[in-house]
């Protein structure tokens, strides 16, 4: 899982779930769907990528690639939607979103990769 150490140290003090995302990003939508499916409370940090809000020095300090989504969970920064989804399902196991059967889980990951 791409857990990164941000240079924007402000996010290290964030408590709870904070999602940096964009309404026009499919990858952001996937993470928002998981947050809602699990019934988790989270704080929205919407970035307008059409106005290039994701390529500012402040955001590069959170995600050096300047991509959305980025999740901050109690100061831990996680990038890449598949890894964020895995983190959420592991950290908040109910309701489970991943099959317990290894073959079914591999098939799920196959379709997740196709859906990007």
Predicted segment positions?
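GST-like domain detector, emphasizing the conserved glutathione-binding G-site
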Residues: 1-116
């Amino acid at each position: 899982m791409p857990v990164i150490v941000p240079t924007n140290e402000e996010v290290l003090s964030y408590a709870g779930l904070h999602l940096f995302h964009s309404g026009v990003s499919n990858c952001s939508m996937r993470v928002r769907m998981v947050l809602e499916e699990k019934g988790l409370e989270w704080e929205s940090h919407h970035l307008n990528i059409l106005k290039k809000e994701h390529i500012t020095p402040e955001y590069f300090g959170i995600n050096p690639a300047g991509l959305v989504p980025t999740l901050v969970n109690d100061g831990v920064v996680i990038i890449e939607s598949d890894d964020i989804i895995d983190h959420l399902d592991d950290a908040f196991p109910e309701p489970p979103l991943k099959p317990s059967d290894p073959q079914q889980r591999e098939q799920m990951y196959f379709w997740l990769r196709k859906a990007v």
